[in-house]
């Protein structure tokens, strides 16, 4: 895998923003060891703008950073879950034929964005919950409750914040003021 310097910088910035933004002081505690993080919008934005590889790495590295600084130890199962969320949401550009880059973001695109956010959260954190049950002998009811709360809460948060951000990105791209070579 050969990543360009730009891609590495984007991953570093995204992971830092997602990681620091995911700290408990910026989140809303909702259940045992479960916090709704507004930083999920950062993960979604980087995934949509830069694709599945960047999305995965921003989620994976960023969640690792959160766990390190929060002081509760690194839960690799949930780190992997965040990576999977970023990867799935990162499919958006290819599924929409890069319409966002052309300044287009319609209701169909928004619906796809929300579906990808839901699938990413259910599948990504579903893997985390399953692995917690298998590897750490966590009670199934606890991890299932965490999964349900996180998947629904994150999807709503990503949909609301993401709508306004992606509308703004589309508007900016439509005005052709983005930084591209002539």
UniProtKB/Swiss-Prot annotation:
InterPro entries: ECF_substrate-spec-like (IPR009825), UPF0397 (IPR022914)
Superkingdom of origin: Bacteria
Organism, as annotated: Vibrio vulnificus (strain YJ016)
GO cellular component: plasma membrane
Protein name: UPF0397 protein VVA0348
Family matches, as Gene3D superfamilies: 1.10.1760.20
Family listed: Belongs to the UPF0397 family.
Any Pfam family hit: ECF-ribofla_trS
Regions crossing the membrane: 8-28, 41-61, 72-92, 110-130, 146-166
Topology class, membrane: Multi-pass membrane protein
Localization annotation: Cell membrane
Family matches, as PANTHER family: UPF0397 PROTEIN BC_2624-RELATED (PTHR37815), UPF0397 PROTEIN SPR0429 (PTHR37815:SF3)
Record key words, sorted: Cell membrane, Membrane, Transmembrane, Transmembrane helix
Primary location recorded for the protein, binned into one broad class: membrane
